[in-house]
Amino acid sequence: MSKNMEYRKHRIEYLRTTVEYSLFGGEGGTREAHLMFHVDPEAGSYEEQLTAIRKAYHRILSRKVKIRGMVPVFCRYFLSDAANQWEALQAVLQKEPSCAVSVVQQPPLDGSKIALWVYLTSEPNAAYKHYLSLIHI
């Protein structure tokens, strides 16, 4: 593993959520991070799992020193039943700061109803907003 790449796994027990993240760059250059949020399959209904994922997302972004200050470029939600889950997700997303969002109907392999992949960077780039500004289903 390169000295410019770091992989971590963090468990948030009270949310029954695991976050895996890889950090790239540093030392004066642009930093990038890929975060993957998983919720335990038995963590309740879709709405409860969505709430747990969003709380974990905010907790990690505000508390992890190496991620703090980074800007989300895009979020990709993996849903088990996008047609029936989209409305609840859309209601949550309208209340939060925007970044490009995509939704994929691909059930998470662990059997949960939702998973989230987030790409962050330390230096926002206007090109990202231009190319990644639409919500895709």
Where are these regions (language model features)?
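N-terminal basic/disordered segments at the start of proteins
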Residues: 6-29
